[in-house]
Amino acid sequence: VLYYDQYQKVVGWGPDIADALAPTGYPKPGVQKVEWFKLQLMLSGNTYIDPINLPPLPPGKSEIDVAADYLFHLRQAMRNQLQKTLGEVFNREERNIRYYLTVPAIWNDAGKAATRAAAIQAGFLRDENDNRLTLITEPEAAAMFCSKTGLLNLKIHDAVLIVDCGGGTVDLIAYEVEEEQPFSVAECTAGSGDSCGSTALNRNFSNILRAKIRKMKLPDGSKTAGKVYAKCIMDFENRIKADFRNNGQKWAVDVGIEAEFPEAGIEEGYMTFTNEEILQCFEPVVNRILELVRNQIIAIQAQNRSLQVSNMTSKQFTPSAN
């Protein structure tokens, strides 16, 4: 996440957003919140990304410019921490540091080139001929982590399916273990994916919320409608999405208005969402992910390979069996 002022200057990034927000928790007047910009880098050649659903970039800024701004601040934070920890050793050896950036498995050459261009613009590299940057796919990095930490006891010829459920997309790919020491893998299925990441939950919730707000029958541009929408979206992002368990619970959101709109589920200052409404946000997304997983398993089984399985999530939501 980045926050830009009206002069296209970054006034907030990642966790450092105090100067960008008003006391209400929303961006100050004239400040634009920019998110999901990583998806902009992978638009070229990736048809399952819908540009219509992506937030607009700041005027005069390209997707590479915005990604470079974020990487610049990430690099500055990293340098500050390393200087505190290593002191003169870091200053002396900084020019020799190699960098590794992870990218989704389904990214094409255009997406990788855009990532590298953003890294150069952010100051990670001196120029295009600097070879200290390596791009590694996120699933491959996950497989290496599983091996090095002992999470999976991977043997030569084992297949491991990596399902990377990210913010914008879900990416899947299966690897076969070629060597245990040093650990190396090779693709054994073609990468697949879809735009069914966490932001798809937000889009589904937004559609349900807008339908409820329309039942309030307020005039276009109503500040009350805008206030209800903003508070519900924030509560879904910060609370409901993480805590949903499909256990019949109702969710009450403090929308901060005195008027009651029972037809929209607003009573005593709270808008209520049923378990079924929140389930509608999750079910199509989770079912699509399961479909992608099944297709990958079928491809692996067709090659008579042994698939290693591990659960690395604490999420308790259980989708329907359909």
What are these regions (language model features)?
Residues V1, T134-G150, N202-N207, P284-N287:
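Glycine-rich phosphate-binding/hydrolytic loop that grips phosphoryl groups
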Residues V1-K9, E176-P182, I257, F261-E263:
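Short acidic-glycine loop/turn motifs at beta-strand connectors
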Residues V1-P51, T134, S184-T199, R203-S206, ...:
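Early-domain small/polar-rich strand-loop-helix modules and first-structured segments
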Residues V31-I162, G226-K227, A242-N247:
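Nucleotide/phosphate-binding catalytic cleft detector across ATP-hydrolyzing
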Residues Q32, K148-E187, F205:
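Gly/Thr-rich phosphate-binding beta-strand-loop-beta motif of the actin/hexokinase/Hsp70
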Residues L41, N91, P104-I106, C196-N322:
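Gly/charged contiguous loops adjacent to phosphate- or pyrophosphate-bearing nucleotide/cofactor binding elements
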Residues D50-P59, A186-G191, P219-D220, E276:
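Short hinge/gating elements
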Residues T115-A122, G150-L152, E176-E180, T189, ...:
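Short secondary-structure boundary/capping segments
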